[in-house]
C-alpha cells in the first residue's frame, strides 16, 4: 500500500473478491468469443482466479496461512492464527455455461475461532456482499418462505424443510449464489446436507452472520472453520425468525 499503510482486512477481502471476479468475467467472455469449450473455460478460470488471490495474499499478508480449493495444503494453518479461506471460483459448472450468473468468488479471514473479514462477489451481476459494510437484512413479507436449492437435485434436508414449512422453491447453482440469495432477501432459507468443503461456505457464512442471519450446521450447532479435515457435511443459512421452524422440520 502507498506510504506503507497496511490495508484493512475488510478492504482487502473486498478488493480480492472483486478483483478475482473481474478477471473471471473478462476471461470467460474472451474465451467463449474465441470458441473455447466449457472445460477449457472452467479450468482457465479456476487457475487465473487462484493465481490472482495467491499473488495478492502473498504480497499483502505474507505471514497469514491460506486454505483454498485450488491451492496446496498450507501447514501453517494448523498452528491457528490467521487463515484466509478462499474459493477462487465457486460454481465452476455455472461459470462454464454462457449466460449463467449464479457463480461466485469467496474470500474469508478466520482467526483462531472467529471470522475477521469476508466478502462474496457475484461477478456476473457486479455485486459484492461483505462483512464491512454488512448487508442490512431486508424486510420481507411472504405467505410462504422461499427455500433456495440446487438446480438439479435437492438434498434430503431441503425436502424435509420444504415439506415442514410449506416452502416455495428457488433453484440456483453455487453455494455462494444460494447463500447470497438469502442475504439479499430473494430467498429465506438455504439448507444443504450433501457434503461440501470449508471454502464453499466460509465467506458466505461470515457475510450472512454479519447481516444478522442464522447460520449453523443442520443440528443447530455452530460451524467451526479451519479444521484439519476441510470436509463440511452440512450447512444452514436462514432468516433468524425461521430458524426454530427449520430445525424443527429437520429434527422434530
Name the predicted role of every residue range.
Residues 65, 117, 188-189:
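Short, Asp-centered acidic motifs that coordinate Mg2+ and/or phosphate
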